[in-house]
Amino acid sequence: MDKIVIKGGNKLTGEVKVEGAKNAVLPILTASLLASDKPSKLVNVPALSDVETINNVLTTLNADVTYKKDENAVVVDATKTLNEEAPYEYVSKMRASILVMGPLLARLGHAIVALPGGCAIGSRPIEQHIKGFEALGAEIHLENGNIYANAKDGLKGTSIHLDFPSVGATQNIIMAASLAKGKTLIENAAKEPEIVDLANYINEMGGRITGAGTDTITINGVESLHGVEHAIIPDRIEAGTLLIAGAITRGDIFVRGAIKEHMASLVYKLEEMGVELEYQEDGIRVRAEGDLQPVDIKTLPHPGFPTDMQSQMMALLLTANGHKVVTETVFENRFMHVAEFKRMNANINVEGRSAKLEGKSQLQGAQVKATDLRAAAALILAGLVADGKTSVTELTHLDRGYVDLHGKLKQLGADIERIND
């Protein structure tokens, strides 16, 4: 079993490049199923285990997938007749596999997708996806752990008001509606940059989508879509993690590919703490020294503070003075990293959906285990400043969302190794 071992105390300096966004590439890969004419080529694709999983799902659905890892590119040819069923053996590994349902319904008029797995954080229900498909005219029923969807008269444009701005549901409905008859309106839509990237991709394929990035998205259905070449946007969560690595070690690093507009809620909090940020055309420079100020954070749907940055920000707040409160409103069960931080001598108490951090914690190296993807990164960040040696296990979580994080940190001056036991 792999582990990452960190000896804390080194300031990070230098330059590091952000990979393509995991949360953009997965829906965009599934959207490639919409192209009945010509293959699509996606570039700036991060080399992640989740990308391999979704590629396997697409192959099962009868798409030809060529993964050119050395070029960070994937070519998807979905011009043949697609299979209707995404089986449990793949879908169980990753929740994003549910995103094949929209494209399959759009292309075939029917789909069978196993109920998803792959995430330890809360229940992440799929009711909003189902609500959207039913509004578009599909009949849905659940049986033997599968979702059966059938739109025997085809999908028809409609108005859909989401109860919550679910990212996955917004993406799935956009994809289904892109080939539906007539106009679809999604109200209370998710506004993440990854939604905008998906809409841009489908528009490049010949789609007619407006309003992505706002509350209301309009999709005018078209007859068919064709493959194109598209570059995936940079990963704002990786960028944020690297900015925090610079700040937590009181270092000075340039994060190439970090886009301020994609992570405004994070950078404003960092500035409030006294972290110095310099915004350049192709990235963000982060510098920090001395004591940082306490701030409170509350996770919210975009453009609020991202839940995917909560645990990393908590690591940074442990090194700041004063009283801090971290409130998680997006997912239940997302404080599992707190118990691991406590093993490192962190002063944190959880009360319901809030974690209270008292004073500056004198972090000490310890053996800890990653409980989810972002917790893995957060524990590594804490290890960068802990006194002594920190060992982080359960790295399969980390590999789902970060490409060579330990290698990047080492290149910036961290004393860090990945060891295969």
Curated annotation (Swiss-Prot):
EC number(s) on file: 2.5.1.7
Binding site for UDP-N-acetyl-alpha-D-glucosamine: 95, 124-128, 308, 330
Residues in coiled coil: none
Top EC class, one word: transferase
Endoplasmic reticulum recorded as keyword: no
Pfam families: EPSP_synthase
Active site, renumbered: 119
Catalysed reaction equations from the record: phosphoenolpyruvate + UDP-N-acetyl-alpha-D-glucosamine = UDP-N-acetyl-3-O-(1-carboxyvinyl)-alpha-D-glucosamine + phosphate
Pathway(s): Cell wall biogenesis; peptidoglycan biosynthesis
Superkingdom of origin organism: Bacteria
Keyword terms, alphabetized: Cell cycle, Cell division, Cell shape, Cell wall biogenesis/degradation, Cytoplasm, Peptidoglycan synthesis, Pyruvate, Transferase
PANTHER family hit by this protein: UDP-N-ACETYLGLUCOSAMINE 1-CARBOXYVINYLTRANSFERASE
Protein purpose: Cell wall formation. Adds enolpyruvyl to UDP-N-acetylglucosamine.
Protein name per UniProt: UDP-N-acetylglucosamine 1-carboxyvinyltransferase 1
Gene name linked to the record: murA1
